[in-house]
Amino acid sequence: MVIQRNWQSLIKPEKLDVEPGNEPSRIATIVAEPLERGFGMTLGNAIRRILLSSLQGAAVTAVQIDGVLHEFSSVAGVREDVTDIVLNIKQLALRMHGEGPKRMMLTATGPGEVTAGQIQAGHDIEIMNPDLVLCTLDDGVKLGMEFTVNLGKGYVPASQNRQEDSPIGLIPIDAIYSPVRRVSYKVEPTRVGQVTDYDKLLLTVETNGAVTPEDSVALAARILQDQLQLFINFEEPQQVRHDEPQDDLPFNRNLLRKVDELELSVRSANCLKNDNIVYIGDLVQKSEQEMLRTPNFGRKSLNEIKEVLANMGLSLGMSVSGWPPENIEDLAKRLEEPF
């Protein structure tokens, strides 16, 4: 089946490394390799855009400050004006459990700085940057605030957070819901065996602490997977599991065939012979990396073998229990059949 061969002949990344930054819970570089040439750019750009636009997070959508009617006011004894206070509030990093909207309260008395850690958030909201300074009070000044917190994604301007029945003094705020602050990626060449034109994707992610970089990338990949599902308009071909018993064997009977029967090209056949691979059962337990380390064995030979194995419901990198059987030669003769 041509469709089957197209997607199964491509190499897939076999490892995902996480290189922590100076704040591991917020900053890390996710490294995926090996990828087919061009896939580093394709996946890196797609995941980056999803990370910045589509992850759900929590943000303050409105604030009410005692004695303040609108955001262009100033508060006696508070060094910052309301506009500056609102800008500081927008920097709050929150993790909310459950649905919104929810409320947070703040009561403070001067002198000194008022920080996010003084907010009474309740058990279902976590403040990830408690050291954030919201404003500075003079001696004896009292300040009270009430925050409205909601869940969302992306960026929502203050105009959309304004409710028609809002009480006087409730100031809507631009909501930056995304827990991801910065994303960058780069693609470097990597090698597998003797082949050097594969891609290595390095995705550097910085979050606000509400989600780890690794989890944010996992969520973005899941979103991408879900969006692409609609485009798959065929059923995946049924593959015979190698661990299903056939003819009282604990593995796929095709494993007992010799690789000479695969009708491979002379180059591929010689590479298998030089590597002492006699049966298909020996071959499928080799990984792609192991095969590519075989002298004179390149990507063309790898793809050829993967296509042939896929047509039998097999693949490289399989784990076969009970292999090799003690009477392998007798079994091979008894089950010998033409393809």
UniProtKB/Swiss-Prot annotation:
Domain comment as written in the entry: The N-terminal domain is essential for RNAP assembly and basal transcription, whereas the C-terminal domain is involved in interaction with transcriptional regulators and with upstream promoter elements.
EC number annotated for this UniProt entry: 2.7.7.6
Sequence segments annotated as region (Alpha N-terminal domain (alpha-NTD)): 1-235
Region listing for Alpha C-terminal domain (alpha-CTD), in residue ranges: 251-339
MF (Gene Ontology): DNA binding; DNA-directed RNA polymerase activity; protein dimerization activity
Enzyme kind, highest EC tier: transferase
GO biological process: one example: DNA-templated transcription
Example of a GO cellular component annotation carried by this entry: DNA-directed RNA polymerase complex
Catalytic activity: RNA(n) + a ribonucleoside 5'-triphosphate = RNA(n+1) + diphosphate
Highest taxon of source: Bacteria
Organism of this sequence: Granulibacter bethesdensis (strain ATCC BAA-1260 / CGDNIH1)
One Pfam match: RNA_pol_L
Keyword Nucleotidyltransferase: yes
Entry function: DNA-dependent RNA polymerase catalyzes the transcription of DNA into RNA using the four ribonucleoside triphosphates as substrates.
Family: Belongs to the RNA polymerase alpha chain family.
Transmembrane segments: none
UniProt keyword list: DNA-directed RNA polymerase, Nucleotidyltransferase, Transcription, Transferase
Subunit comment: Homodimer. The RNAP catalytic core consists of 2 alpha, 1 beta, 1 beta' and 1 omega subunit. When a sigma factor is associated with the core the holoenzyme is formed, which can initiate transcription.
Protein's recorded name: DNA-directed RNA polymerase subunit alpha
